[in-house]
Amino acid sequence: MATLRPELRELWQELCVELVLGQRGDLTGAAAGRRDRLHAERLAQLKSGSYTVAGPLALGATAVGGTPAVHRALHRYGIHAGVAFGLRDEVLGVWGDPAVTGKPAGDDLLTGKSTVLLSLAMDRLSSSAAEALQKTGCAAMTSLDVAVLQDALFTAGVNDDMEKLILRHVEDACLSLTDEALHPVGVAGLMDLTKTLAWRTS
């Protein structure tokens, strides 16, 4: 750290703060059983948008002396691409194949994490299924509860809602890459990265 240029050290420290804020929000949100969309979207932007994609891009742009226009374009791209990554993580956390993801089926339902997916579920599920949703994160939740809730969420269209959200953020990320300040070679690489982030299976 001591050998980093001051502006890079400052950016790194900002990333560390965002990391702590994101993890804190994750833990407190799960403990409080928060399901509101505002909290979930704020977490998605902090955890996935800021320090997973936008922050590292800012470090790279700063290291090579990128112009303010480059920084603005990369920040817009990073937030949208990062949120798309986070939303895909939420989909995989509910319906992902354990053999591919390496996590238990319905892992996010078992832990009761505060996610955009679960905030959407609050508006979509029937009263009986919504009762099952209240069990998320509780020790009393069984594998049968998880399976029932997975099916209820899918039937209610929550998966479709998530795919639309992911696509919207992918489109906004790609639109950010049309900025003339960005180099074509870098744009091509980021376009490929966007697809990997948004449509991965693990």
Predicted regions span which residues?
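All-alpha prenyltransferase/terpene-synthase fold signal
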Residues: 1-202
